[in-house]
From Swiss-Prot:
Predominant localisation class: cytoplasm
Subcellular location: Cytoplasm
Positions of the record's site feature: Activates thiol group during catalysis: 180
Keyword Cytoplasm: yes
EC number, as in UniProt: 1.2.1.12
Name assigned to this protein: Glyceraldehyde-3-phosphate dehydrogenase
Assembly notes: Homotetramer.
An annotated Gene Ontology molecular function: glyceraldehyde-3-phosphate dehydrogenase (NAD+) (phosphorylating) activity
CDD domains, per database record: GAPDH_I_C (cd18126), GAPDH_I_N (cd05214)
Length: 335
């Protein structure tokens, strides 16, 4: 039996979650509903043509209040209050909360009132029953976890790397910088924004701003709580980001040991989540890459044995959207 999911919010993440399900060919998850306040025809057009990921490789049909992307009609609604969505009627197992609005447990729980069995939020969520980075701590999911956060794209990139390196050599303390592609909450020209850095034109400057992604690793890996912090620099590219992590190891290590630990994990327990490259790649090379994190082996540096610097790439849209599907399926198996 496939897990039935409904997508609330058909923006960058909502559309990519559906596309990732279709393109991967997976049959263990079925999208039965989409809720978005935009016209059905507009949502279909934006799904069909994507400036970042290219044209959808299949046919997209609209008939009444449905969209068909190759697996039969998907019901489309335009309801403002998630508590009023037809989850019960449609037998929704997992509501994928992708609006970026209902990001606290209390707000996201409206989907439960509508009849969904569980909710997965596509962002950090205050008060969530559990914050999950698939491949790192998804096995902690239990029947008690009704509202779950899928963390952020940056935490999904950092956590697998941090887990492997903490297990291998120990992390005393560390600081991460994410060099991050601009996103939809940044303007094309200067305008009002509560964050004055993000008030500036996205494609014209490198923009320092904040991120809670490093601290959030402590929610996923309690052994690293309080040991990591970070910052963000938004750059004038539309997709693909990279983390630059510097940490103090608990014991002396080497570039070779660090890289070997990553290669071993990426080839075994974290295969499909953590990847690696030894090529002189640049950001565009990782566009549409489904990994949560792709470690750049030749960028590893070790100073005086214990000061370590590593670099890992991530498609901040596509990788995260693939993990939304993975986590939703894991939640669906809870019953």
């Amino acid at each position: 039996m496939s897990v039935k999911v409904a997508i609330n919010g058909f923006g960058r993440i909502g559309r990519n979650v559906l596309r990732a399900i279709i393109e991967s060919g997976r049959t263990d998850i079925e999208v039965v509903a989409i809720n978005d306040l935009g016209p059905v025809e507009t949502n279909a057009h934006l799904f069909r043509f994507d400036s970042v990921h290219g044209r959808f490789p299949g046919e997209v049909k609209v008939a009444g209040d449905t969209i068909d992307v190759g697996r039969g009609p998907i019901k489309v609604t335009a309801v403002r209050n998630p508590a009023e969505l037809p989850h019960k009627e449609l037998g929704v197992d997992i509501a994928l909360e992708c609006t970026g609005i209902f990001t606290s447990r209390d707000k996201a729980a409206a989907h439960l009132a509508a009849g969904a069995k569980r909710v997965l939020v596509s962002a950090p969520a205050d008060g969530a029953d559990l914050t999950v980075v698939y491949g790192v701590n998804h096995e902690k999911l239990t029947n008690e976890h009704l509202v779950v956060s899928n963390a952020s794209c940056t935490t999904n990139c950092l956590a697998p790397v941090a887990k492997v390196l903490n297990d291998a050599v120990g992390i005393e303390k560390g600081f991460m910088t994410t060099i991050h592609a601009y996103t939809g909450d940044q303007p094309t020209l200067d305008t009002m924004h509560k964050d004055l850095y993000r008030a500036r034109a996205a494609a014209m400057s490198m923009i320092p701003t904040s991120t809670g992604a490093a601290k959030a690793v402590g929610l996923v890996l309690p052994e690293l709580a309080g040991k990591l912090d970070g910052t963000s620099i938004r750059v004038p590219t539309p997709n693909v980001s990279v983390i630059d992590l510097k940490f103090v190891a608990k014991r002396a290590t080497s570039k070779e040991e660090i890289n070997e630990a990553i290669i071993a994990a990426a080839s075994q327990q974290l295969k499909g989540i953590l990847g690696f490259t030894d090529q002189p790649n640049v950001s565009i090379d990782f566009n549409h890459n489904p990994n949560s994190s792709t470690f750049h082996l030749d960028q590893t540096k070790v100073m005086e044995g214990t000061l370590v610097r590593v670099l890992s790439w991530y498609d901040n849209e596509w990788g995260f959207s693939n993990r939304m599907s993975d986590t939703a399926v894991a939640m669906g198996k809870l019953g």
